[in-house]
Amino acid sequence: MKLNKLIAIATISLLSGGISMAQKALNLEDIVAGNIIQTKGIGSMTWLKDGERYSRLENNKQTGGTDIVAYRAKDNSREVIIPSSLLTDKSTGRPIPVRSVSWSADNEKILIYNNTRRVWRYDTRGDYWVLNLKDGALRQLGKGMPESSMMFAKFSPDGTRVAYVSNNNIYVED
């Protein structure tokens, strides 16, 4: 009798486990499209010069743009250091979409990367902008270049120039 109950319980648990474990079969289209695993991270973080805060990009739902926000590591206090209103293209009046930013060594300018295009596996082509935090001036680099053709832009060590690659040539702008 006990054996019959044990067999019945085992059979029910195996059958119900098989039903709950039924999943959609993997196919190549889902894998290539990136529909299999989706992760959500906190995005890129950059330590600021003071060594006590880091900056992150955050969407501003009111403006549709991107704020650059600083968080203090000790207490996680939050401060918007560059509002999306400063990251607006003056010619169109619309906020520029921000993919990533890098700071100059003195934290007085930021290099903004946007409008990215994939080359092989990585988004290495795009457009670059420089925001001068002293006067709030936002300037697009490579104005005469084709859209999304610039790569690997970096500040000079003194933060006065930016170098980038486009069409296998190296350019430097003040």
Residue ranges and their predicted role:
Residues 1, 19-20:
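Glycine-centered signal
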Residues 1-8:
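Bacterial N-terminal signal peptides that target proteins for export
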Residues 8-17:
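Bacterial N-terminal signal peptides
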Residues 20-174:
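Beta-propeller folds
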